[in-house]
C-alpha cells in the first residue's frame, strides 16, 4: 500500500468511527481517545487529518448531509414528473437510511442539543434538503398531481417527519 492509500484509509477509518460514535453519543459525549480506539489509529492522526475534534465533527455532519444533497442532484437531473421525483427522492433517502439507520440520530441529536455547527449546518445543509422537497411539492401541485389546497412546506415537513420518525424508532 502506498502512502497516499494508507493516508486515505486511516482518514476514512477515523471518519467512519467518529460518525458511529457521534451518532450514538453526540459531540460532547465522545472523546478523541474513543475515536482513535474505535478506528484503530493513533489519536494524533485525528489532529493530523482533521485538525481536531471540532473539525472532525463538522466533516462528519457534512458527509452525512452530502449523501442527501447528492441524491438531490441525481433526482433533479431526471426528466420525470415532480411527483415521481418526490417519490424517487423519498425512496432513495429511505435506502440510504436502511444501510445506516443509526446515523439519523447524528442529525437529530444536533437539532436537539445544538453545538457550534447547528446554525451553519441547518442554513447550509438541512434547509437545502427541505427546500428541494418543498419545490417538488409546489411543482406537483402546479401540474395537478397533488391537491391545490395543500401547503408545500407543510407537506414537505410532514414527509420529512415521517421518514425521520421511522428511522429514529426503527430497531427500538
Spans of model-derived segments:
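An amphipathic alpha-helix adjacent to DNA-recognition modules
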Residues: 8-16, 28-29, 49-73, 87, ...
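Hydrophobic alpha-helical connector segments
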Residues: 73-105, 152-159
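Helix-turn-helix
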Residues: 2, 13, 21-55, 59
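Short helix-capping/turn signature of helix-turn-helix
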Residues: 50, 109-114
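Hydrophobic/aromatic-rich alpha-helical bundle segments in the mid-to-C-terminal region
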Residues: 104-109, 119-123, 141-172
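Short amphipathic alpha-helical elements of helix-turn-helix/winged-helix folds
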Residues: 17-21, 162
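Amphipathic alpha-helical packing segments from all-alpha helical-bundle domains
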Residues: 66-69, 73, 99, 116-142, ...
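N-terminal intrinsically disordered/low-complexity leader segments
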Residues: 1-9
Amino acid at each position: 500500500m502506498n502512502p497516499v492509500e494508507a493516508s486515505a484509509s486511516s482518514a476514512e477509518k477515523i471518519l467512519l468511527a467518529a460518525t458511529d460514535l457521534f451518532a450514538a453519543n453526540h459531540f460532547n459525549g465522545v472523546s478523541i481517545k474513543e475515536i482513535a480506539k474505535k478506528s484503530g489509529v493513533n489519536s494524533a492522526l485525528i489532529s493530523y487529518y482533521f485538525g481536531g475534534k471540532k473539525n472532525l465533527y463538522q466533516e462528519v455532519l457534512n458527509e452525512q448531509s452530502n449523501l442527501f444533497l447528492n441524491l438531490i442532484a441525481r433526482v433533479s437531473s431526471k426528466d420525470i414528473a415532480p411527483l415521481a421525483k418526490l417519490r424517487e427522492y423519498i425512496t432513495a433517502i429511505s435506502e440510504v437510511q436502511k444501510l445506516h439507520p443509526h446515523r439519523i440520530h447524528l442529525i437529530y441529536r444536533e437539532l436537539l442539543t445544538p453545538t457550534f455547527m447547528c446554525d451553519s449546518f441547518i442554513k447550509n445543509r438541512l434547509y437545502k434538503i427541505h427546500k428541494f422537497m418543498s419545490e417538488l411539492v409546489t411543482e406537483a401541485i402546479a401540474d395537478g398531481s397533488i391537491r391545490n389546497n395543500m401547503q408545500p412546506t407543510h407537506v414537505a415537513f410532514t414527509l420529512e417527519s415521517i421518514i425521520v420518525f421511522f428511522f429514529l424508532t426503527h430497531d427500538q
